[in-house]
């Protein structure tokens, strides 16, 4: 009986460990974000739009930036899943967008950057 209870407890913990692995590290994300600073900032538009408060924001609506028609019409809200797809391959996520970034293919760095973006409110 003890083995059955232990097995059930371990089985219940597996989803929690998977979530912990998916959670990004904001400090590592700040470092991974460094190349993005060539176009993006927090609190002002640059070559790319202002990313302050981007998590949870609708795509293509930040005031003062000239977005592509494709991004404006995408209907995307920048949640974790959409940010992951976008940062991995912007041209595949929204064909016709203006972002020239080829994408970040490393899933750990993606999670870290998204965690970092989430701290920029």
Which residues does each PLM region occupy?
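Bacterial N-terminal signal peptides
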Residues: 7-15
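Electrostatic cytochrome c docking/interface patches
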Residues: 16-33, 73
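Short Fe-S-cluster ligation motifs
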Residues: 63-84
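The canonical Cys-X-X-Cys-His
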Residues: 29, 33-42, 113
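His/Cys-centered metal/cofactor-coordination and adjacent catalytic loops
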Residues: 21-23, 43, 47-54
């Amino acid at each position: 009986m003890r083995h059955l209870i232990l097995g059930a407890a371990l089985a219940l913990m597996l989803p929690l460990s998977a979530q912990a692995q998916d959670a990004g590290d904001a400090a590592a994300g700040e470092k991974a974000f460094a190349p993005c600073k060539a176009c993006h900032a927090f609190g002002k538009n640059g070559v790319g739009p202002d990313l302050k408060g981007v998590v949870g924001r609708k795509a293509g609506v930040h005031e003062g930036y000239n977005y592509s028609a494709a991004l404006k019409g995408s209907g995307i809200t920048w949640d974790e899943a959409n940010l992951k797809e976008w940062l991995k391959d912007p041209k595949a996520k929204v064909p016709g967008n203006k972002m020239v970034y080829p994408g970040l293919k490393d899933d750990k760095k993606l999670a870290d950057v998204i965690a970092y973006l989430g701290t920029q409110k």
